[in-house]
């Protein structure tokens, strides 16, 4: 495709009609740096869409005329950087194109619950200007994907809200904050810093990063101590806050993930920085009935996100297998207590990059998927002592997070504070077809489809009506009905939800 520079709104509209491709859109205000390069190259590598970079210095985002006049303008270099790193087209409109004097442009208001904190405290109207220009650009360009940096976290939240509020069919893709050699977040305004000012900014960023490191050990933050250290360096602090990362309200002690964000001034330059604090790595809880695709989907998600795969259903099946093998009357509490005391259930990766299940050092991966086990596992899993024992084992595995677990009570009982909860389901017909074609359930392949539907209905009834941890959708779970969707489509949907819930830069290293 020929590289193209577009300067008029009429041209962008005509170009949009002529192209036969979706658009990845990377909005910028010019003076491009490595952070912008990361956005452009990420868009290029993500898919085969056309990549459009816009360069527009939005006057509505500046606190005063002098700030606008002093903003670096490096258009020729910006064009070279954009095209060199994957842009197919560049949109460079004028003020008159974006804000035509005789046209009724929608001047938007940012949501007050997100714009009144942090930068919004002193930059009145700034985020209104952000919403106005981005909404104008999105309406002109109509992209499939919008690429934004997490460096401007508050702005990212507000633009996500804008896309949701205006019901725009646009996916927002974010990239982590990109830092320079001395730890400072890359910013177009860094060129204004003197050597001494840069040292102060670097000290500020290092303090935030050190606070993140300490939080991983101590699970608490001391704002007063950080402010004291900054004040001793004569750093002018505009704000330093510990907040919930999505509501921007004061962080609560029970929050697993929180935001430590600050803004300082050095000379005439104002800079922002933040870090995410996590008590443990994220957890994804996937619940749903038999045959809904939980196992297949969960395994793929674990692989793609590099998370531990915890198959809690396999743990109940493994215990059921041992009960049958040892011919134990599980209705007798003393017999059950003995087996719970001595059982060892271990997951091991095999040479096929799959997970094998071992009971007391014996591999039972295939045996626990038999219909014989399926017919008894719901009864055994409804026993109070069994559930208490295995739930405790599962929680031990999840103490440090970093896992995706599937079962029937993950989001309600095992990990009620999971960052993302999914309730995966499908129609009885669809689930019966899947179970019958499941190569790991050989005995199910020989059962009549009608009979299999009845077995699934029976299992659903047992799971949903048991007194302890019944199969129910958690209040904050997102339901996904998988009829008509491929496995990969479901996986991609859940990963998108995960990326929307978990900042990319928040992962504990």
From Swiss-Prot:
PANTHER family: CYTIDYLATE KINASE (PTHR21299:SF2), CYTIDYLATE KINASE/PANTOATE-BETA-ALANINE LIGASE (PTHR21299). Residues 276-509 are annotated as: Cytidylate kinase. In the N-terminal section; belongs to the pantothenate synthetase family. Catalyzes the condensation of pantoate with beta-alanine in an ATP-dependent reaction via a pantoyl-adenylate intermediate. Gene3D superfamilies: HUPs, P-loop containing nucleotide triphosphate hydrolases, Pantoate-beta-alanine ligase, C-terminal domain. GO terms for molecular function: ATP binding; CMP kinase activity; dCMP kinase activity; pantoate-beta-alanine ligase activity. Its EC number is 6.3.2.1, 2.7.4.25. HAMAP family: Cytidyl_kinase_type1, PanC, PanCY. ATP binds at residues 29-36, 149-152, 186-189. It catalyses: (R)-pantoate + beta-alanine + ATP = (R)-pantothenate + AMP + diphosphate + H(+); CMP + ATP = CDP + ADP; dCMP + ATP = dCDP + ADP. The active site is at 36 (proton donor). This is Bifunctional pantoate ligase/cytidylate kinase. One of its GO terms (cellular component) is cytosol. It comes from Prochlorococcus marinus (strain AS9601). It is found in: Cytoplasm. CDD domains: CMPK. Keywords: ATP-binding, Cytoplasm, Kinase, Ligase, Multifunctional enzyme, Nucleotide-binding, Pantothenate biosynthesis, Transferase. Pathway: Cofactor biosynthesis; (R)-pantothenate biosynthesis; (R)-pantothenate from (R)-pantoate and beta-alanine: step 1/1. NCBIfam families: cmk (TIGR00017), panC (TIGR00018), PRK13477.1 (NF010004).
């Amino acid at each position: 495709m020929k590289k193209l520079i577009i300067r008029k709104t009429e041209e962008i509209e005509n170009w949009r009609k002529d192209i036969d491709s979706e658009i990845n859109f990377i909005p910028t205000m010019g003076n491009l740096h490595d952070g912008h390069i990361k956005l452009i190259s990420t868009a290029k590598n993500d898919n085969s869409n056309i990549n459009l970079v816009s360069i527009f210095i939005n006057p509505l985002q500046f606190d005063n005329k002098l700030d606008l006049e002093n903003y670096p303008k490096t258009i020729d270099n910006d064009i070279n950087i954009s095209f060199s790193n994957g842009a197919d087209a560049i949109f460079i409109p004028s003020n008159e194109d974006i804000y035509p004097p005789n046209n009724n442009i929608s001047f938007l208001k940012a949501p007050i619950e997100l714009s009144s904190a942090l930068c919004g405290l002193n930059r009145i109207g700034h985020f209104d200007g952000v919403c106005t220009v981005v909404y104008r650009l999105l309406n002109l360009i109509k992209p499939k994907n919008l690429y934004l940096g997490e460096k401007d976290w508050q702005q990212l939240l507000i633009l996500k809200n804008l896309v949701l509020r205006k019901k725009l069919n646009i996916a927002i893709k974010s990239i982590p904050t990109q830092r320079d050699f001395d730890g400072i977040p890359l910013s177009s305004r860094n060129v204004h810093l003197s050597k001494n000012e840069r040292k102060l900014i670097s000290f500020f960023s290092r303090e935030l990063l050190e606070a993140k490191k300490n939080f991983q050990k101590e699970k608490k933050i001391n704002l007063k101590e950080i402010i004291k250290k900054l004040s001793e360096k004569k750093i002018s602090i505009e704000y330093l806050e510990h907040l919930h990362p999505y509501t921007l309200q004061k962080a609560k002690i029970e929050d697993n993930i929180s935001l430590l964000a600050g803004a300082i001034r050095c000379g005439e330059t104002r800079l922002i920085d933040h870090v995410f604090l996590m008590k443990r790595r994220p957890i994804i809880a996937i619940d749903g009935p038999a045959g809904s695709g939980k196992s297949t989907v969960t395994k793929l998600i674990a692989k793609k996100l590099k998370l531990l795969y915890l198959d809690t259903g396999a743990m109940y099946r493994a215990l059921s297998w041992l009960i049958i093998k040892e011919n134990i009357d599980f209705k007798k509490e003393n017999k059950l207590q003995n087996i719970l005391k001595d059982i060892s259930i271990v997951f091991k990766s095999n040479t096929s990059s799959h997970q094998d299940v071992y009971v007391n050092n014996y591999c039972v991966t295939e045996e626990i998927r038999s219909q014989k086990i399926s017919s008894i596992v719901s009864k055994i899993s409804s026993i109070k002592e069994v559930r208490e024992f295995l739930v405790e084992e599962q929680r031990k595995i999840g103490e440090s997070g970093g896992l995706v677990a599937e079962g029937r009570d993950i989001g309600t009982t095992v990990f009620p504070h999971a960052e993302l909860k999914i309730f995966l389901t499908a129609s009885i017909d669809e689930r019966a077809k899947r179970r019958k074609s499941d190569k790991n359930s050989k005995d199910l392949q020989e059962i009549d489809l009608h009979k299999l539907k009845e077995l699934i209905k029976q299992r659903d009834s047992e799971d949903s009506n048991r007194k302890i941890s019944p199969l129910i959708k958690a209040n904050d779970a997102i339901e996904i009905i998988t009829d008509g969707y491929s496995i990969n489509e479901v996986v991609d949907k859940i990963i998108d939800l995960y990326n929307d819930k978990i900042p990319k830069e928040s992962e504990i290293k």
